[in-house]
Amino acid sequence: MAERMTFPMYAIHRQQTQALWQAVQSLLDERGVMVAGDPPAADPGDLLAHWRQPTLLLSQTCGYPLVTQLPEVQTVGCFHYAAPGCEGRRYRSLLVVREADSHRMLGDFFGRRAVCNAEHSQSGYNVLRKMVAPLSREGRFFSAVMFSGSHRQSLRELQQENADIAAIDCVTYALLQRHQPQALAGQ
């Protein structure tokens, strides 16, 4: 039975995502593993539901939900990206602010607004929580924390001045720099 395969985490440049899908499909085919259909044309939406689909053979996931919410999922490998901030399988999050605030230190954002992609994101939420914890007062640091649904949307919220700071993973940032630099304008 042929099963599905998707790479939703960094699907910023459709042609590159399709090329990755086709290369992996070819490798699997050589080993007798059939993958159904063509590369998905759309974002799968709810990623946690997507990762739990019984017909899903191979996908990408953020490490935090992998270890906290997906016990039925098996790790088969880890991509090594060439983006600045990546070293082998390790990567970093970047704290991104508007250009007008680029001279500020993290402590200067006390009482300001943060935007995070999702509560189940290591790179967009938990890393920021860990960084501000020693700076918090009575368990609080930001005046508000909103969830945008994606790193790209978090950047839009910064551009629209709905938030003041966001943590963005370095792979997303590098791909946006290369393929959609307007998404980083003003930051």
Q: Across the structure, where does each feature detected by a protein language model lie?
A:
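Bilobed "Venus flytrap"/periplasmic-binding protein-like clamshell domains
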Residues: F7-A23, G88-S148, S154
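N-terminal hydrophobic or amphipathic helices and topogenic motifs
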Residues: M1-Q74, C78-Y81, E87-R90, H103
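Conserved residues at the C-terminal ends of beta-strands
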Residues: S59-T61, N117, S148, D169
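Short hydrophobic/aromatic-enriched beta-strand-loop microsegments
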Residues: T75-C78, F141, A166, A185-Q187
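Short, surface-exposed acidic
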Residues: G32-P39, E138-F142, L184-G186
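Alpha-to-beta junction loops
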Residues: W51-L58, R112-A114, Q159-I168
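A ligand-binding cleft/hinge motif common to bilobed small-molecule-binding domains
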Residues: T61-L70, Q159, D164-G186
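Hydrophobic hinge/microswitch elements
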Residues: S148-L155, Q159-D164
